[in-house]
């Protein structure tokens, strides 16, 4: 027996340096990245800050996003997942440490026949320590996989926060546009009402027919319907805000118009920087590392396992004298799971296959991120051009409306010509506002696809 224990311990010493055999060196997946985004504009601006929305210089927007981040249940749930993953990582790490144990028992016995028939009371106690020597780094690989998963969970939380901030900013500006359009609709309704009063006076004097009178009334009804539509749209946005803030009142009230200042400049940077910015890509790479560690752990399961145990205990007829004569024991055991060669090969192949799948999915996510960024940057350029063109359209339509009004008052054109000019002018103004909103939302999208970042305010 002594020779057997000595042999087992000798094997442990011989195998102690073999842990590196089963660990695979991580190499980032090779992907072909362009040197720069095709639609990136040269800029001396610094990279987007973590709290990217503060670059707009709108304290009310800052307060809205701060409240959403503080109250959102999805973000709170993500934080709970982070804490749970961290606890699981700690639990996996404890497997590398000696595991203490102990037992305490007491009992009584009495013979059923014979003499003497006195009761015999006995007690025993044992303190034990077990330690699995991680010869082939199986436990270390499992711990690393759990740590990577915990880190990935933190990136998931940051991705939720980034998306939440983007959603809040988008809703904020949609509500601003809704209020702006409502005010514009009220002004248009008043202008149309004054036009109708002019036509009504002309009709009573016989200057125009009932056709012009009905056209003026139709235009007024259309503006009243439009005002009602905008009121409904704002009510729906307010309900969405109520859900976002869980019923809390929006801090600072509602924005009444879209911001008119220049948009914050964004330095797009190199595509490779996406890996360091986007939390979803960081999470994907961390899970790639976790899958590699899990694959190594699956392989290491089929290597010999050596466990050491030690105990200190005693037994006595008297509980107080339990450890008066302690008994110690030291043992070692080795299992040889590699003898099941068929199962080992299949499970190892399955683990490697899962890692290969994770590599493919990571590459897919990266290229999708590159495409999203190119699309957003291209839209930024085109939206700026469209806004300039729409500015000219609005200016010209306003001047055309003014000229047709003068001609109508002079009796040179029919009422319908003037009313159509008014409609085109209103549509041009609305289209310009819609483009402005699209630019703001595109700015949010760019910050999001570049991993604008988030830290607890």
Q: Where do the language-model regions lie?
A:
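Small/polar, glycine/serine/threonine/aspartate-rich low-complexity segments that form flexible
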Residues: 41, 47-56, 103-128, 142, ...
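Periplasmic alpha-helical coiled-coil/stalk elements that build and connect Gram-negative outer-membrane
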Residues: 139, 154-270, 379, 403-406, ...
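Terminal intrinsically disordered/low-complexity segments used for targeting and assembly
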Residues: 2-70, 147, 231-276, 282, ...
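Sec/SRP-type N-terminal targeting helices
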Residues: 76-77, 93-94, 133-161, 211, ...
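A short glycine-centered flexible hinge/capping loop motif at secondary-structure junctions
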Residues: 203-207, 408-412, 449, 453
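Membrane-embedded beta-strand positions in outer-membrane beta-barrel channels/transporters
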Residues: 65, 124-128, 172, 271, ...
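Transmembrane beta-barrel architecture of outer-membrane proteins
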Residues: 61-63, 122-124, 170, 215, ...
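Acidic, low-complexity, intrinsically disordered peripheral segments
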Residues: 262, 377, 431-457
């Amino acid at each position: 027996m002594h020779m057997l224990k000595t042999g087992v311990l000798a094997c442990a010493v011989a195998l102690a340096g073999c842990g590196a055999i089963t660990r695979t060196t991580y190499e980032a997946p090779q992907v072909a990245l362009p040197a720069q985004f095709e639609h990136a504009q040269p800029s001396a601006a610094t990279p987007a800050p973590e709290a990217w929305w503060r670059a707009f210089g709108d304290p009310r927007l800052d307060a809205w996003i701060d409240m959403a981040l503080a109250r959102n249940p999805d973000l709170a749930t993500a934080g709970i997942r982070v804490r749970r993953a961290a606890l699981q990582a700690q639990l996996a790490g404890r497997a590398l440490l000696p595991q203490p144990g102990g037992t305490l028992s007491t009992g009584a016995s009495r013979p059923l026949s014979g003499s003497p028939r006195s009761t015999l009371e006995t007690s025993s106690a044992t303190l034990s320590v077990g330690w699995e020597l991680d010869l082939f780094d199986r436990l270390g690989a499992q711990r690393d996989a759990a740590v990577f998963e915990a880190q990935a969970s933190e990136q998931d939380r940051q991705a939720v926060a980034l998306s939440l901030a983007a959603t809040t900013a988008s809703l904020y500006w949609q509500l601003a546009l809704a209020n702006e359009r409502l005010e514009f609709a009220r002004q248009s309704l008043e202008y149309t009402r004054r036009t109708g009063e002019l036509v009504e006076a002309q009709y009573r004097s016989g200057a125009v027919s009932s056709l012009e009178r009905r056209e003026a009334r139709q235009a007024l009804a259309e503006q009243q319907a439009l005002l009602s539509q905008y009121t409904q749209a704002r009510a729906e946005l307010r309900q969405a805000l109520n859900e976002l803030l869980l019923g809390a009142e929006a801090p600072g009230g509602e924005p009444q118009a879209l911001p008119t200042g220049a948009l914050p400049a964004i330095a797009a940077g190199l595509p490779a920087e996406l890996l360091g910015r986007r939390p979803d890509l960081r999470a994907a790479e961390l899970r790639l590392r976790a899958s590699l560690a899990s694959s190594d752990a699956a392989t290491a399961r089929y290597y010999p396992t050596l466990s050491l145990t030690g105990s200190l205990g005693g037994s006595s007829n008297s509980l107080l004298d339990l450890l008066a004569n302690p008994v110690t024991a030291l043992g070692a055991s080795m299992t040889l799971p590699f003898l099941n060669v068929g199962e080992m090969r299949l499970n190892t192949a399955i683990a490697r296959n899962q890692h290969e799948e994770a590599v493919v999915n990571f590459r897919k996510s990266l290229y999708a991120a590159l495409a999203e960024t190119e699309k957003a940057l291209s839209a930024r350029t085109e939206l700026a051009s469209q806004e300039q063109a729409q500015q000219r359209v609005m200016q010209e339509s306003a001047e055309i409306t003014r000229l047709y009004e003068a001609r109508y008052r002079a009796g040179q054109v029919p009422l319908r010509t003037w009313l159509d000019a008014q409609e085109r002018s209103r549509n041009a103004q609305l289209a310009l506002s819609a483009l402005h909103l699209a630019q703001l939302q595109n700015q949010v999208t760019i910050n999001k696809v570049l991993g604008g970042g988030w830290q607890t305010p």
